[in-house]
Amino acid sequence: MIAIIKFPGTTCETDVYKALIEAGVPTVIVKYKDFDPDRYNGVILPGGFSFGDYLRAGSIAASTETMKKVKQMAEDGKIVIGICNGFQILVESGLLKGALLPNLKLRFISKWVYLKVIRADTILTKGLDKKIIRMPIAHAEGRYYVDDIDYAKTHMVLQYCDENGNISEDVNPNGSLLNIASIANEEGNVIGMMPHPERASFKLTSIDGTVDGLILLRRLGEWA
């Protein structure tokens, strides 16, 4: 069972829930104060504006007792995935290295993007090496940065690219270091991503009927 943790200000929990059900993954939405890590094989921290994004995006949620429990789950090898604001929570809590800074042009960005799978050894991307997928982003603080370039190169999972998989500054929507859209820990069980797979999981609501989000989410089935 995968727990979708809802903090005050989380807004995407229902979309993630419906997408996981569509992907055949057993899941439940859990309020952060009610979270019991012993009941779940993994967690997803969905998008939104946890605790109003006061101080910094994700910083207050990162300091909760709930995230201490999530950290222990990660250390135990269980799945921890952060989407958008969830990714911000993961870096603020130290589960992933780096920071998510305001977009380079200081504007909220909402658009569909192409992504190249760089690491095919994570829970979500096994067997997808160099595959090009398409999902939407929607954020104001999604510019990934880390002061360790070697870490960035070895831990990035997805990079922003064009439809042919070419990676350049021209297709970097927010100024992220090395066009990074997603990173994971060395073990591949803790993954943070700015794109929203849940918004690319239904033909009716996806651009051109794209359901590439399901390609990633279905891989959670063997763990749930």
Swiss-Prot record:
Domain Glutamine amidotransferase type-1: 1-224
Subcellular location, record wording: Cytoplasm
SUPFAM superfamilies in the record: Class I glutamine amidotransferase-like
GO biological process: 'de novo' IMP biosynthetic process
Protein's pathway: Purine metabolism; IMP biosynthesis via de novo pathway; 5-amino-1-(5-phospho-D-ribosyl)imidazole from N(2)-formyl-N(1)-(5-phospho-D-ribosyl)glycinamide: step 1/2
Pfam family, one: GATase_5
Positions annotated as active site in the UniProt record: 84, 196, 198
Keyword Ligase recorded: yes
Keywords: ATP-binding, Cytoplasm, Glutamine amidotransferase, Hydrolase, Ligase, Nucleotide-binding, Purine biosynthesis
Gene Ontology molecular function: ATP binding; glutaminase activity; phosphoribosylformylglycinamidine synthase activity
InterPro entries: Class_I_gatase-like (IPR029062), PRibForGlyAmidine_synth_PurQ (IPR010075)
Recorded catalytic activity of this chain's protein: N(2)-formyl-N(1)-(5-phospho-beta-D-ribosyl)glycinamide + L-glutamine + ATP + H2O = 2-formamido-N(1)-(5-O-phospho-beta-D-ribosyl)acetamidine + L-glutamate + ADP + phosphate + H(+); L-glutamine + H2O = L-glutamate + NH4(+)
Gene3D superfamilies recorded: 3.40.50.880
Record's keyword annotation contains Ligase: yes
EC annotation from Swiss-Prot or TrEMBL: 6.3.5.3, 3.5.1.2
Gene Ontology cellular-component terms listed: cytoplasm
Main location (coarse class): cytoplasm
Role description: Part of the phosphoribosylformylglycinamidine synthase complex involved in the purines biosynthetic pathway. Catalyzes the ATP-dependent conversion of formylglycinamide ribonucleotide (FGAR) and glutamine to yield formylglycinamidine ribonucleotide (FGAM) and glutamate. The FGAM synthase complex is composed of three subunits. PurQ produces an ammonia molecule by converting glutamine to glutamate. PurL transfers the ammonia molecule to FGAR to form FGAM in an ATP-dependent manner.
PANTHER family: PHOSPHORIBOSYLFORMYLGLYCINAMIDINE SYNTHASE SUBUNIT PURQ
Quaternary structure annotation from Swiss-Prot or TrEMBL: Part of the FGAM synthase complex composed of 1 PurL, 1 PurQ and 2 PurS subunits.
The protein, known as: Phosphoribosylformylglycinamidine synthase subunit PurQ
Gene coding for it: purQ
